[in-house]
Amino acid sequence: MKPLVLMRGGGDIASGAVYRLKRAGYPVVINEIAIPTMIRREVCYGNAVHRGEMILERFVARHVALSEVADTLAQGVIPVVTSSYEELLDTLKPAIVVDAILSKKNLGTKRDDADLVIGVGPGFTGGHDVDVVIETMRGHYLGRCIYDGPAQPNTGIPGNVGGYTHERVIHSQKAGLFTAKRHIGDSVQANEVIGYVDKEPVRAKITGILKSGLIVSDHFKLADVDARCEEAHCYSISDKSLAVGGGVLEAVTAWEYERNQDGNDL
């Protein structure tokens, strides 16, 4: 039996890591917040919190209570649990923790939370608050394992997709109630209204958009633009997510290999 992995976060990048780990036979439990705000929710196992169940690229994720985790894992399903991180640590005692919340800072993950602790993206330092960091910035170092030092700092500039950076990310201009008028996979024209924050229109061409009915803060990310206009991309795990997921899987398998080597030497 492979060691249990606890994944903090169920967004699109975390889901790429969950997919890679599941394909390699690792049992994974996702820890999500009660009201997730992922943009690309069609490719997020954490969307099971809203739907009850989420199917993504052959694997099923299900929103369950902590008491149901063991039975859910036995069914080959990915449990998505909204209990506190501390409660999951105490109850499940995972061998591996992956923090893929992507908040650009460490929200409480500690190196002694598990035998192997992995941080995804900026906000972590390999060999300090986590054992290893996975690079998330697009480019040459994407998906690399960093055992000594931090990931590249957040630049605040979205990665280049289809020739666009700042233009492809849409933020709210005020706090209020967000209501979507367009949906994931819709093709829209530039400046077309895709939704409202209260009565203020939001305009863009989108591949992802927040679930309607959420209260958002000022400058909250509402939508993600993809000028490539490939509808299938809206429903499949992205190249970036899989690259980061590959880095997570490498860190896990390298740790297992080294642990087994140490055991053979005894």
Regions found by a protein language model. Give the residues of each.
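Well-ordered secondary-structure scaffolds
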Residues: M1-L266
